[in-house]
Structure formats: C-alpha cells, structure tokens
C-alpha cells in the first residue's frame, strides 16, 4: 500500500508541475525598457570609479541594480526615465549589467590606462542640461539652447548645416560621452555618410586617405555653397 501511495504522489507531481520562475530576459530590439547611455560598448575607460548613465522606460521599474562581472556593485533609483550611479572597475575586461523588472542589458568595457572614451564634462550634473526630475529628464528647452549655455554658437554664417539649423546638436554629438573627438557619435566621415551619399558617388577633385570631408567642408555653417571652407 505504501508503495502505491508513493507512486501516486510521483504521478501527481509530474501531472501538475509547479509554476516556473521566469528567467531574466535580454532587452528586445526597438524601444527597450532599459538602455545604457554611457559608457559605450567596447569603450576603454580609466580603472576605478566609472559613471554609468542609463534610461528606463517610465513605469517599468522604480530602481535598477548594476552588476560588474556578475557581482552587485550598486543600486540606483530609476526616477521618471533615468538613472545614474558610479561603479568601480578593475583593470582588464569588465561586463556591466543593469537589471530591472526582469529585464537585463549588458555593456562590455575595458579598464585601461589607454582611454578611448570621453565623458561630457557635465555628465555628473544632470540638472545642467535636463529639467527637474519630476518632468522625466527631458531637455530643459531647445537642445541647441542648452548646448549654447556653455559652447560658442556655430550657426553665425549664411548657410547652416541641417541638423544645427534644426536645433539638434545630438544628431552628431552624444551629450553624455563618446569614443570620438568632440563627442561625435561616429568618425567625421562616418557622420557625413549617415545622411549624405558616399564621396565616391560624387565628383571630388582628389582621392586620398589623408583628405576627409571636413578638410573641405564646414560641419556647422559656412558662407559658401555646399558648406565649403
């Protein structure tokens, strides 16, 4: 009888399995609920204290956990769409992982004396560019107006480059940090072909690796056609 009861218990446990604990999922493509804005993937940053800046879709989570190489290093409040926290990296390869609401996003960086990633000088002072937190970290005014609080104006000539004329410096520049000089989101030539045809499709007087788009063209504004220098 005892053997029969035991067999029945095993049968019932197999017939009615317990609810599985959902595993963490990686961010979906498109409009991810969690996003790391800085540092960039593959960036080389100084060893030690590193600032992690990110965005969380409003209503997703009230806080995030930031792991470094699998160990929890920091917890941060995710208030109205943004979070910021400092973690400590050891020399060599490091994996940053941000968790919230069952979702996970990772970023691989290298802590090295040879630095390739540059933060915006105001990165740790969100309020310098963003409105108060209760408004969801929106930019406090037109984007270029915020930039001109510190930077010289670049639109003073007759012809103004399209993104700058539209007041959006962030088409070409990352306001948090980047691996390129002047915090551009790509190399100088890479930026141009994001919108323009490849140079090989037009008539250029000279072909040389030493000559790039900005050798002849102004990226902001110019008094000559085609934004020539």
Please provide the spans of the model-predicted regions.
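Surface-exposed, short loops/turns at beta-strand junctions within beta-sandwich domains
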Residues: 86-93
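Conserved structural position at the C-terminal beta-strand
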Residues: 98-100
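Bacterial N-terminal signal peptides
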Residues: 7-16
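Short, compositionally biased P/S/T/A/G/V-rich stretches that sit at domain boundaries
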Residues: 20-45
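Short beta-strand segments within Ig-like beta-sandwich modules, predominantly Fibronectin type-III
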Residues: 73-81
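Aromatic/hydrophobic beta-strand junction motif of beta-rich domains
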Residues: 51-58
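Inter-heme linker and motif-flanking segments adjacent to c-type heme-binding CXXCH motifs
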Residues: 104-110, 114-120, 127-229
